[in-house]
Amino acid sequence: MLIHVIIFMIITTMQFSTTCHAYVINVTNVNVSMFPAILVFGDSTIDTGNNNYIKTYIRANFPPYGCNFPGHNATGRFSNGKLIPDFIASLMGIKDTVPPFLDPHLSDSDIITGVCFASAGSGYDNLTDRATSTLSVDKQADMLRSYVERLSQIVGDEKAASIVSEALVIVSSGTNDFNLNLYDTPSRRQKLGVDGYQSFILSNVHNFVQELYDIGCRKIMVLGLPPVGCLPIQMTMAMQKQNERRCIDKQNSDSQEFNQKLKNSLTEMQSNLTGSVIFYGDIYGALFDMATNPQRYGLKETTRGCCGTGEIELAYLCNALTRICPNPNQYLFWDDIHPSQIAYIVISLSLVEQIFHVLS
């Protein structure tokens, strides 16, 4: 009930804001301290800035990205403000924002309370990482090992192992894999088909979660796919086949099918890994509800991003010279792939409810 009240208060307040720089959102924690730290892996939905420090064209460390982040800073987050890990960390009473592990200025406190290893543009499929020059999940696991070593230097081996085992671990990836290798280019589709590619990705998810477990993580939430067919970029790609901008049913059906398989796989993994709590995090439901019932959330545009035309703008195509919409809070998406901050708030609150359900 508290979660729904928070959503209502945020959305009601934000209706009075009409410009990108007019507001900064702070979600107050609910005085819950279930976890000593938060550790984050995956892609641009949760990358808080690691790509700033690697050689890749997949970056968001320039305006108008971050125009609603505290200080109106473009931190490398692919949205107009904060992301899922920031809001969850805040709601859980861990900290207000989750820094990227590659930030050279991390404090001991930053390390102790957790960091982000995610890399925008990455996926479970190595083809995705090679296409975008980003950090694969294997490299992210290596970064976790480096993190544990640094944490041990600060608090000692025993305390470090305790922090890692009790930390909330969030994994969010896969969308880039399906977009790049299944729908937009035929590389994997021709060889494996949809069902075969889903099995391939699930195998890679299994291997990655196993690796996290072997390093010491025990409380792991793996997020499923969003309604991929409702992403503006996918609607744009499909315009040659359909004359209107609307969600692509087949791609959404594929997402739902994959998510059910993922949920089943994670349940099986938990039963085989002693002392683990490995569970599925649903983001499909919240995003699809916003896409199909926008009035509930004060949204007026769900098929285009706020940046530029909202149909093709992403990364360097969404820049300081690009026109942006007057009120991002009325848009489900910030650019042609990534949700707006208001959407991330709704998704994060939904995930917090799921975390409480599983772990409380």
Swiss-Prot record:
UniProtKB keywords: Glycoprotein, Hydrolase, Lipid degradation, Lipid metabolism, Secreted, Signal
Intracellular or extracellular location(s): Secreted
InterPro entries to which the protein is assigned, alphabetical: GDSL, GDSL_lipolytic_enzyme, SGNH_hydro_sf, SGNH_plant_lipase-like
First-level EC class: hydrolase
Glycosylated residues in this chain: 26, 31, 73, 126, 272
GO cellular component annotations of the record: extracellular region
Gene Ontology biological-process annotations: lipid catabolic process
Gene Ontology MF terms in the entry: hydrolase activity, acting on ester bonds
Pfam hit, one: Lipase_GDSL
Catalytic residues (positions): 44, 335, 338
Gene3D superfamilies: SGNH hydrolase
Protein origin, superkingdom: Eukaryota
Enzyme Commission code: 3.1.1.-
Family, as annotated: Belongs to the 'GDSL' lipolytic enzyme family.
Name listed for the protein in its UniProt record: GDSL esterase/lipase At1g06990
Species of origin: Arabidopsis thaliana (Mouse-ear cress)
